[in-house]
Amino acid sequence: MRKISEPTERLVPDRCREALYNEMMTALGRIAEEHMHLPAFRFFVDITRSWQEKMCGEMEKPLVVVAGTGIPDELLRAAGGVPSYILGGSREACMYSDDRVPRDADPVSRSILGYLYQMAVKDTSSVLILIPLYSDSMRKIAYQLNLAGWNVVTVDMPPLQDSSTALEKWKEQVLQATVAVADHVHSRITATSLKKAVREAVKARSEMQMFLRTVTCEENVFSPMARILVQNSYYYTDDLAEWTRNLGRLRDEIWQTICRKGDRYRDAPRILLMGSPVFFPNEKLPSLFSDAHLHVVRNIDPSTEVFEMIPHIAKAGNSAERILTAVAEEWYRHDVSGAYIRNETLRQKIMEILETDEVEGVVYHILKGQIEPDFELAWFEEFFEKADIPVFRMETDYQYQDVEQLRIRMEAFSEMLTQRRFSRRAMMRSIIRNGPTFVMRCQSRSD
């Protein structure tokens, strides 16, 4: 396996940057055209475009790169470093990292490594890479980058979530990562900078919660792919306060459009999406949902659960250490990544969703190579079976060879959910029309 810092052909990174840029610009142009009726959406398209241009441009000043999600972003901002997140989602980046990653690496890890490989960095010491170790693939990437001479700081996710020892280990690692960022950008962590960063993050996440409740009303107004782009842009913005204001404007525009339409809800099966995360510009899964007429009412994965994290720092006073501890504990309590042997937080979250949202089916998305979500699938299948909610396990990657096969299966799943809805409505009409005697006849037949 070749080292990342030693490409076999000098022009490869240039071709990779061009391919990545074209892939992103094509996807952005298409989605911007589809949502021209929402002027505020342009802001989030521009943020994503600026991020792409930065990642494909010349890197000169000290840069803090976060590979994936899972590290408290408010602490990194408070430390003075505006983090440049690489989330994944790029098929082109996967292709350019194929011969530099283990064969069993998942598409997200491949995409992250492809982005890191193409970066135009004159001195690798000017880049600090933070890597949350929530999967086996991320551990392998961290090892490869270390071997290649990059400046890497890892944050290990403890395998046990209900252990006080694990919590202390997590807080210690988060503190070390925050200090490493401050040292890298020659800044200081203060209680004032921490409070400011936490306040901005709380406002942004609270606004995102309201935004998501609005867009789930009517997907004809705002597509699943556009929703993913807006969610991802949280990680790409350099000014979180400005991002929050524009998200509020976009939410108002969407709501006004919904009110003008009159019909707030689509007559489509309402599903819960969980498992592996979906990142822009990977349009594969959202397009399948649209083709199969499935309405995603909730999406739960490690990248989206950050919007549920609202640290309470009022009791921390002016102590920077207490604020750091409060933030780290909040992230630890809400983490739904696959790092844990038993992810009780994820299980509890699913139970809460079923109590508050009408869910007719579940799409359990698994990217090939991400074995962690598969470990939890058996428990969820049994749980959803008891709740009488069908589960569709969909394993795929960033390639498009299996799209037609997946579309057929997805449409069959959608049709099955629709028929179940009609059957239940027919039974309810019979109960209303015939009264308790109809229920007694049904019970006697089942016996």
What are these language model-derived features?
Residues 2-63, 175, 179-311, 321:
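A charged, amphipathic alpha-helical module
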Residues 54, 61-121, 141, 146:
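An N-terminal, globular interaction/scaffold subdomain
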Residues 65-74, 132-139, 275-281, 368-375:
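Gly/Ser/Thr-rich loops at beta-strand to alpha-helix junctions
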Residues 126, 354-364:
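Proline-aspartate-enriched helix->loop->beta-strand connector
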Residues 381, 385, 391-430:
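C-terminal regions of proteins
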Residues 113-179:
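Acidic/His-rich segments in extracytoplasmic proteins that coordinate ligands and/or metal ions
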Residues 58, 68-70, 74-89, 94-97, ...:
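Redox- and metal-dependent alpha/beta enzyme cores, enriched for Fe-S-associated oxidoreductases
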Residues 115-116, 341-358, 375-376:
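A short, acidic, amphipathic alpha-helical segment used as a generic capping/interface helix at domain edges
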